[in-house]
Each structure stands twice: as structure tokens, then as C-alpha cells.
Amino acid sequence: MSEICSIVKGEPLCCTERLKERVEYGFASDLMSDVLTIKSVNFLLITGLTNIQLLRTAEMADAPYILLCRGKKATEEMLRLAEENNILILRTKFSLFRSAGLLYSNGLKALY
């Protein structure tokens, strides 16, 4: 995760101990109903959404890592819930398209 953070020039917002972990797959979406269809665990969710539903969806979908794009800011409630569920949140100024492209070209695999 620390390499992913570097690639997108990201900033960790919580659960920084998870930066030592590795993730093999990523999924980019602003549509949380699509995220809930995923049958995988341990993936990076790349999104531009910043609401509490994002954290609820990540928890249900077993996505322990979130990348917020376009410089979006997490609310205090989001950060509290992320800490409670041990979900690492990163933030980047890059767009969702650019972030996903950079990560894919650097070896992050697509779920499908």
C-alpha cells in the first residue's frame, strides 16, 4: 500500500499501519451497488465518493483499502468508522481515471 500511495502521490488519512500491507487487485467505481457485486476480498476501492455509505459498502464488500480521488476529503464520521473497521483511507489529487491508469500500469490487477 505504501507503493500505491507513492504512485498516486497520495496522503494516508487513517489506519496508517496498513501501509505495510500488499494488495493485488483494484476496483474503480462511484456506484456502490457495483462494488457490492464483487466476489473478492482484499482489494483497493478507488472512488470519488465521500460519504458514510462508502465506508458501509467497503465493510460489506471486504475492501480494506480506499483511495479517494480528485482531492476529496473524508468527513470525521468517515474517519471514525474507518478506524473502527481498520480500513485504510488514502487521498489523491489525481482523477479516478488517472489514478486507476497509473496503478494498473504499475501492476495493480483488475478484478475483472
Show the residue positions of the predicted features.
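Short secondary-structure junctions
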Residues: 10-16, 110
